[in-house]
Amino acid sequence: MVRSLVRRLLGRSQNNGTAAPALELPPEDSRARARAMVMGLQDEICAGLESLDGEGTFVEESWERPEGGGGRSRVMREGLVFEQGGVNFSEVQGQELPPSILKQRPEAKGHPWFATGTSMVLHPHNPYIPTVHLNYRYFEAGPVWWFGGGADLTPYYPFLEDARHFHRTHQAACDSVHPDLHKVFKPWCDEYFFLKHRGETRGVGGIFYDYQDSSGVLYKGQDPSGPAAGVSAQLGARPLGWEQLFALGQANGRAFLPSYAPIVEKRHPMAYGDRERQFQLYRRGRYVEFNLVWDRGTIFGLQTNGRTESILMSLPPLVRWEYGYKAEAGSREALLTELFTKPQDWLGDASLEDRCRPHGAIN
């Protein structure tokens, strides 16, 4: 009843003395549909990952949040492929928004809020298999609503075709909704998953988007002079309705297994030794640094009294730091740090093959 009243009040025209709303109103069942979508993604992805691993299974733990909402955390440990992996679902609500949200959307101040999403991080045993992350979410606060999400790949050893396959698959998912989305969401991913204190990206990127509503502004990040902002400004407004943005999250969520499973199947049989394992553990340190220092999802979860175990489930089980480490010149480890932790045009730059070929890092 309350939501219907809000919809009627916000829907008044200027003839009634009130300006029409800037945003399209979400459907009456928006929360239920968003919840069902992300829960469905969690189920589909967990089933696919158990099949991919062949031995490991997810153990589920349900939890409730005293202020409202809850979720279910699923963790796999010591599988055949995955050393540790977690796939979360959460649905939380409250009366007062945390500072991390109000900084971005001050117009949401004073409204009860609702958020639901699924997130996942997988840390494989084999250093030749990349770590991978995804997150798809929906948020409402009074008249304000938006979708956000993305997926990114973090290799420990460089393979050009792995990066290209991951990007190609997510580009196709974005293009199924609108052909201009990937042009902004790819550089936005490079921008977001960037360790400023290290001057490097977390990996080869993928896609990232946030605060997507019917306003049509594709880039709503924090670097107005960056590549993503530039592309967005050049393209201009691309108004997408609630249904299209819902379809975007669903399409990219369902693109995850096709984007990642072929990489796992190709790299899992590759033999590795202590050198590769030690480098993997060292590079995992960058993952920890990003998640604890820069990640807005981690900050939001902690500021809203989320479940700490679920929030920090993304961290790897083992990691190491080494003071002043430098990769051996000309090594594959050096290629990773020189090429695969810098923003690249993975699908359009043919010169990447020339740089990867001497290291056997194409296929």
Curated annotation (Swiss-Prot):
Active-site residues, as the UniProt record annotates them: H133
Record protein name field: Oxygen-dependent coproporphyrinogen-III oxidase
Organism: Parasynechococcus marenigrum (strain WH8102)
Location of the region described as Important for dimerization in the Swiss-Prot/TrEMBL record: 287-322
Residues binding substrate, per UniProt: S119, N135, Y136, R137
S-S bonds: none
Biological process terms in GO annotation: chlorophyll biosynthetic process; protoporphyrinogen IX biosynthetic process
Transmembrane portions of the chain: none
Swiss-Prot/TrEMBL site (Important for dimerization) positions: H197
Reactions catalysed, as given in the entry: coproporphyrinogen III + O2 + 2 H(+) = protoporphyrinogen IX + 2 CO2 + 2 H2O
Chain's role: Involved in the heme and chlorophyll biosynthesis. Catalyzes the aerobic oxidative decarboxylation of propionate groups of rings A and B of coproporphyrinogen-III to yield the vinyl groups in protoporphyrinogen-IX.
Keyword Metal-binding: yes
Entry EC number(s): 1.3.3.3
Keyword Metal-binding: yes
SUBUNIT field: Homodimer.
Molecular function terms, GO-annotated: coproporphyrinogen oxidase activity; metal ion binding; protein homodimerization activity
Membership in a protein family: Belongs to the aerobic coproporphyrinogen-III oxidase family.
Biological pathway: Porphyrin-containing compound metabolism; protoporphyrin-IX biosynthesis; protoporphyrinogen-IX from coproporphyrinogen-III (O2 route): step 1/1
Gene this chain is encoded by: hemF
InterPro entries with a match to the protein in the record: Coprogen_oxidase_aer, Coprogen_oxidase_aer_sf, Coprogen_oxidase_CS
